[in-house]
Amino acid sequence: MGPKLFKPSIDWSRAFPDSVYWVGKAWTISAICVLAILVLLRYLTPWGRQFWRITRAYFVGPNSVRVWLMLGVLLLSVVLAVRLNVLFSYQGNDMYTALQKAFEGIASGDGTVKRSGVRGFWMSIGVFSVMAVLHVTRVMADIYLTQRFIIAWRVWLTHHLTQDWLDGRAYYRDLFIDETIDNPDQRIQQDVDIFTAGAGGTPNAPSNGTASTLLFGAVQSIISVISFTAILWNLSGTLNIFGVSIPRAMFWTVLVYVFVATVISFIIGRPLIWLSFRNEKLNAAFRYALVRLRDAAEAVGFYRGERVEGTQLQRRFTPVIDNYRRYVRRSIAFNGWNLSVSQTIVPLPWVIQAPRLFAGQIDFGDVGQTATSFGNIHDSLSFFRNNYDAFASFRAAIIRLHGLVDANEKGRALPAVLTRPSDDESVELNDIEVRTPAGDRLIDPLDVRLDRGGSLVITGRSGAGKTTLLRSLAELWPYASGTLHRPGGENETMFLSQLPYVPLGTLRDVVCYPNSAAAIPDATLRDTLTKVALAPLCDRLDEERDWAKVLSPGEQQRVAFARILLTKPKAVFLDESTSALDTGLEFALYQLLRSELPDCIVISVSHRPALERLHENQLELLGGGQWRLAPVEAAPAEV
C-alpha cells in the first residue's frame, strides 16, 4: 500500500466561525467559574478575606461597572490566547505532516502524493501567517489593556490607602495600638505596586500582560488543560509496561507526573511564604534606619556618633542577610526541583509516541502535535507548582497591606477627647482628663473657658503633661477623655508643635501650609515674611529645596507664626513654639500675633517665665494629676 495523500488535520474553512463560537462559549463558562471561585475564596480563605477588605471598594464602588468590563475584556484576551495556541498546534501538525507526505512522494516517485504534501505545506504557512498577525495583535492589545487596568487600580488603591491612613489621624494613632506596624510608607508605595500587579512578589513591569498575573495565568492554564486534553486524548495510544496495557497512556502519564511533582514542590516551597514576608519586613527596617541617619545627619555629626550608628546599622543588616540566605537556599531547592521536572519531561512524549510513528499508525505531524499538547498540559498543570514562590510573595504583600488597613481601623477606634464646635468662637474644656498609657492619671478632670481674645499659658515641670494635654486636645493622644468646644470651621483652630512641620515643595508651599499656595498673593506672602523677620526669604518663594534642612529651627518657628497670620485662626495652641528664639524676638512675635489677630484665643505651653507675662491666665500642672488655674500675677504685657 503506497503513501496516502495529505489531509488537513481540521477543516480550516470552518476554523474562524468555529473559533468564534468556541471563544464565546469558553468565555461565558470561564467568567461564571472564575466569579464563583473568587466568591468562595472571599468567604473560605483568610487571604481571600484580607484581599477583599483591602480593595473591596474598587470592585463595588461607583466605577465598578467599568472595572468589571475591563476584567471581562482581559478574560476574553486569555481565552483568545488559548484558542490561538490550539490552532497553532493543528497548523504545526499540518506543516510537519505535509513535509512528511512530500518526502514520501519523492521517495516513492508518486507525484500526486508529493504535490499534495507541497500544497499542504504552503497552505499551512499561509494559515500560520494569518494566525501570527492575530497573535501579535492580541499580545500587544493584551499588554496595553493589562497595564491600563493595573495602573488605574494602583492609582485608586494608593489614594484609598493614603486617605485611610490620614483619616482620623490614624497615621499617628497607629503608634498606640497593641500590635504596631512597621513602615506604612513602604506598604503604600511598594506593596501596593506588588498587590495591583498581581504577578507575585515583584512590582509591575511595562511588559506584563495577563499571562504574567497570577489570576489570569491560572485561568489560562486551566482552559489550556481542558482544550489540549481533548487533543492529547485523541492522539494517545496504548502503552505496554511489563505486560500491562495502559490505554490513552500519554494523557495519564502527564497527569500522574505533574501531580507527583506538584506535591513535592509544595512541600519544598511552603516556607517561602514566611521567608518572603520576613525579607520585606527586615529590609524595610534597615532602610528606615538609613533614612533616620540621613535625616539626623547634623545631630549625629555633632555627637561624633558614626561608630555607634555603624554598629546599629550592622545590627539591623545582619538579620536581613541571615534571612535572605535561608530564602536563597529554599529558593534554590524549589527552583532546582522545578527545573529538573521540566527538563525530564521534554523528550517523554516523543519516546512514548515513537513506536506508533515507526509502525505507521500516526504521522510525524501527529507526534509533533502530541508533544505540543503534552507540553501545554504539563506547563499548565505545573502553573501552581512553578508559581508557588510568586504566590508566597503575593501573599506577603496581602499580609502587609491588610496589616496597614487593620492598624488604621484600630487606631481610629482608640478613645479620644470629644470635640464639638463652639457657638460663640470660645474655647471650653469640659472634664478633660489625661492618663498615661499605663492608666495612671496625668491630669485630673479639668474645666477651663476662654472667650474671644483670651489667652492661657500652661506651665509645669518636665513630664507633668503639658505637651500631652495639647496632644489630647488635638485628638492625637488616645488616653484622654472629656469634651473640647472650640471654633470648628476649617483651620479656625490651629495646633503648632515645637518643631514645625516643613513639607516638601517650594518655599511658597512651606509658608502657606496648610493652605493652598495658589490662594495667597505674593504681596501678602512677602509682607508676612517681613513681619516675622524673614525678609531675606522673600525672593526665594519659588525655590524647591529640602527646606527642613535649609531653615534653622528658629527660622522654622518664625515660618510657623507666618502661617498663623496667613490662616487667621480664631484659636491657636502653641507647644513651646518659640523655644528656639531669643526673648526679644519671642516677645515681638507674640505682640505681632495679638495686634494682627486681636480676637484670636492663644493657648501656649512654655518653660519661660517671661512668656507667662504675655498671657492673662496660667494653668500650672503640679504633677500627680493636680493642677492650679489662676490669673497671671503680673499684669499682662502689651502684646
Swiss-Prot record:
Highest taxon in the source lineage: Bacteria
GO molecular function, one term: ATP binding
Keywords, alphabetical: ATP-binding, Cell membrane, Membrane, Nucleotide-binding, Translocase, Transmembrane, Transmembrane helix, Transport
Modulation of this protein's activity: The presence of cobalamin does not affect the ATPase activity.
InterPro entries linked: AAA+_ATPase (IPR003593), ABC1_TM_dom (IPR011527), ABC1_TM_sf (IPR036640), ABC_transporter-like_ATP-bd (IPR003439), ABC_transporter-like_CS (IPR017871), ABC_transporter_sub-D (IPR050835), P-loop_NTPase (IPR027417)
Span of domain ABC transmembrane type-1: 67-393
This protein's name: Hydrophilic compounds import ATP-binding/permease protein BacA
Organism per entry: Mycobacterium tuberculosis (strain ATCC 25618 / H37Rv)
Gene responsible for this protein: bacA
